[in-house]
Amino acid sequence: ILAELGLEPATHSTQIVEPEFMADFVHALISTFGVLANLADDMRHLQRTEIAEVAEEFAAEQVGSSTMPHKRNPWNFENVKSMWKAFTPRMQTIYADQICEHQRDLSNSASQRFIPEILVALVSVTLRLNRIMSRLVTDAERMRANLALTEGMVTAEPAYILLAAYGHPDAHEAVRRITLEAERTGRPLGEVLFASAELRPWLERFTPQQREIVLNPARYTGIAAQKARGVCAVWEKRLGLA
């Protein structure tokens, strides 16, 4: 059976197998649970009214709230987080089971019977997330609107990096002052930046692509999309999904 599971027998044991093997295994389960709960919590917050960039798909007759007919609560994502909160504390019990008096008492005989529930819970939330994420509704227009809220402030980072790369002696401070001016006047950061006579000697060296990144925050993505696809490809191959 061990061979079929890709496992090896312990190098030594008493009347019991060393409990550290189980502790490491369950820790991996709980750690995975945390990753899924973090994803669920991110999606849950992105569904809030003031953000509203994503949403769980709702059927025509589905009820989102028992008291507010208009609501579409992210109840599936909330379920995943709730399950994580319920099962994460069980890791403490697993650690406690490492202590076995004289390597053979029965103080873990009851507590270890609940370990399969952790596996069942993890499989359950995985299936739930697979189902919900495959039907996730995204709002690109809302994403663009949220990005525009700060009038391009996010491009302060590439602006100061480029200025420094072209030799400005204190690019961070220079851009910090530009952001203050942009906030005071309500003008986009890129507009204020490229209107600066003080910074013109360095700004003139920007390539068209670099200027576009500073003027258009939506272009400031680097290789994020490429990396995301790469990570997905790696795990699809490892999990036999490719």
Task: Describe each model-derived feature in a short phrase.
Residues 68-242:
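Glycine-rich cofactor/substrate-binding loops
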